[in-house]
């Protein structure tokens, strides 16, 4: 990205990205066998993807609960983590962990930028009731990196930082942008009604996400 002019609009670029980006880390032990067979879409982790030029990352966080027993009181405590999932399968990376990797990558390469497209990977088998609060807290902790979406956002404004676009809301106004009207249509005419809404501005979006599982 160092070769691209600062005043070039980000929306005019073709940016390499990865689907279910964190599956390259593999899955937690209980999900390894089925996850590798059904849900693994990447062979490289985020650092390795960055090294080969990937700058847009599809993340699917949900709340993972672990119950532990304190030996002194014999009471169970619940630890909640924003784990990255693909469907029912938990990868070995967390939402916060991805930000740590990208922070290090941007500090080493300040002319670059990253885009995160995220959604709540809901499941009837998990309690996601704290998802909104946990996502908002994680993004607030990394607010120095996050850029507010606007349709005329330029490369120069985004260098060294991250544009976070969420398909699900976690607070009234986004930290980055909200994608509204995500489409799964095969027909081009039906792919156009989507929008990206930032804190104060919004832009139209054509979503091409048609797929056929056979």
Residue ranges and their predicted role:
Residues 165-214:
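C-terminal active-site rim and adjoining tail of enzyme catalytic domains
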Residues 106-109, 139, 166:
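Sec/Tat-exported extracytoplasmic proteins
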Residues 112-135:
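Internal, conserved structured core segments that host functional sites
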Residues 19-21, 56, 61-65, 120-125, ...:
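Solvent-exposed loop/turn segments at secondary-structure junctions
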Residues 91, 95-98, 136-151:
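Acidic, His- and aromatic-enriched active-site or binding-groove loops in soluble protein domains
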Residues 1-52, 65-108, 113, 172-174, ...:
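Long, acidic (Asp/Glu-rich), low-complexity accessory segments flanking structured domains
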Residues 153-168:
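Short, intrinsically disordered low-complexity segments
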Residues 11-16, 55-59, 114-118, 162-166:
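Structural recognition of the beta-strand scaffold that forms the well-ordered cores
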């Amino acid at each position: 990205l160092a070769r691209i002019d600062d005043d070039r609009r980000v929306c005019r670029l073709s940016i390499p990205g990865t689907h279910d980006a964190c599956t390259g880390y593999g899955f937690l032990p209980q999900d390894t066998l089925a996850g590798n067979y059904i849900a693994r879409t990447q062979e490289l982790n985020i650092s390795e993807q960055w090294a080969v030029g990937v700058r847009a990352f599809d993340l699917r966080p949900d709340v993972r609960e672990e119950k532990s027993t304190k030996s002194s009181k014999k009471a169970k405590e619940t630890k909640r983590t924003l784990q990255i999932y693909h469907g029912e399968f938990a990868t070995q990376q967390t939402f916060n962990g991805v930000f740590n990797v990208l922070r290090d990558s941007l500090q080493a390469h300040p002319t670059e930028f990253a885009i995160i497209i995220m959604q709540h990977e809901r499941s009837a088998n998990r309690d996601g009731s704290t998802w909104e609060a946990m996502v908002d807290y994680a993004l607030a902790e990394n607010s120095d990196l996050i850029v507010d979406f606007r349709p005329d956002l330029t490369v120069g404004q985004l260098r060294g930082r991250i544009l976070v676009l969420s398909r699900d809301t976690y607070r009234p106004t986004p930290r980055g942008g909200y994608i509204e009207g995500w489409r799964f249509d095969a027909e081009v005419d039906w792919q156009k009604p989507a929008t990206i809404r930032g804190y104060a501005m919004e832009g139209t979006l054509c979503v091409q996400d048609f797929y056929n599982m056979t």
